[in-house]
C-alpha cells in the first residue's frame, strides 16, 4: 500500500540514507528503531505504550494472537463474519473471509463467528433504535460461549473498518458494547488497523478512535511502510510483560 504515493521523494531519500548507514533486522536494536518506536507509540492513547516491530500484517496479527493467549492463558477467539486478518494457518482460522471461502475448511472449535455489523443487509439495520449495541451484544454472546468452553476466552479481534467485508463502517456503540463485555469476561480486545490505519479513515488517525474506545492490542501493517515490509503491534506494558515472562 503506497500510502503517500509511489516513489515519494522523502520516502526514497530516507530509505537511501538508512541503507547507506546500517541494514539489519529488528532483533538488534539501534537508535533509529528506538526513536521510531517511541514516535509511533506517541500516536496512541495510554496505556498503549509498548511497540513490537515485525515485517508484515500477518506477522502482526499472529503476534497479537500470541499476546492475547499468553496474557489470558486461554485459546478461544471471537471474530467477525467475513473478517480477514492474514494468511498464516492460525490467522486463516480467525478469518471467515478465508476459511469459509473456496478451499476453506471452516473455523475450529476455539473460534466463534459473530455477525458482520452491516446496517444495510445485516441482522440489525438502520431501522433498529441502537443497532451497534445490538451487534455488540452478539459478540458478548459468543464470548460467553467460549468462556464456558474448554478453550476459554482469549479475546475479540475486529478490523476497525471491515475491509474485505465491503468497507463496512462499524455502527456507533458497537465496539464500546463489545469491548465492555469481552473485558468483563477476562478477554482482550484487538483492533486490526492493518488496512485502515495511519489516517486512512479521514477524521482520525486510527479507525478505532471513531468508536471512542481504547483497545488492548493494535496491529499495524500495509500503509506503515508505504509498500515496504514493515508492520507493528502496539500494546500495554502489562500485556507485553506477561508475554515476555
Enumerate the predicted regions with their spans:
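Conserved N-terminal phosphate-binding loop of PLP-dependent enzymes in the Aspartate aminotransferase
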Residues: 1-245
Amino acid at each position: 500500500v503506497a500510502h503517500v504515493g509511489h516513489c515519494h521523494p522523502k520516502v526514497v531519500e530516507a530509505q537511501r540514507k538508512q541503507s547507506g548507514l546500517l541494514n539489519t533486522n529488528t532483533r538488534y536494536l539501534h537508535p533509529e528503531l528506538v526513536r521510531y518506536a517511541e514516535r509511533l507509540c506517541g500516536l496512541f492513547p495510554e496505556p498503549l505504550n509498548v511497540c513490537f516491530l515485525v515485517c508484515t500484517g500477518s506477522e502482526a496479527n499472529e503476534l497479537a494472537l500470541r499476546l492475547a493467549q499468553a496474557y489470558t492463558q486461554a485459546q478461544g477467539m471471537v471474530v467477525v463474519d467475513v473478517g480477514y486478518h492474514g494468511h498464516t494457518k492460525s490467522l486463516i482460522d480467525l478469518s471467515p473471509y478465508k476459511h469459509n471461502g473456496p478451499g476453506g475448511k471452516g473455523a475450529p472449535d476455539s473460534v466463534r463467528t459473530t455477525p458482520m455489523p452491516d446496517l444495510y443487509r445485516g441482522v440489525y439495520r438502520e431501522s433498529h433504535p441502537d443497532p451497534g449495541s445490538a451487534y455488540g451484544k452478539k459478540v458478548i454472546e459468543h464470548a460467553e460461549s467460549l468462556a464456558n468452553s474448554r478453550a476459554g476466552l482469549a479475546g475479540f479481534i475486529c478490523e476497525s473498518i471491515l475491509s474485505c467485508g465491503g468497507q463496512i463502517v462499524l455502527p456507533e456503540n458497537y465496539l464500546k458494547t463489545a469491548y465492555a463485555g469481552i473485558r468483563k469476561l477476562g478477554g482482550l480486545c484487538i483492533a486490526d488497523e492493518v488496512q485502515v490505519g495511519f489516517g486512512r479513515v479521514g477524521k482520525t488517525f486510527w479507525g478505532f478512535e471513531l468508536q471512542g474506545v481504547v483497545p488492548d492490542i493494535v496491529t499495524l501493517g500495509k500503509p506503515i511502510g508505504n509498500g515496504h515490509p514493515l508492520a507493528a503491534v502496539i500494546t500495554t506494558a502489562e500485556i507485553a510483560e506477561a508475554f515476555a515472562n
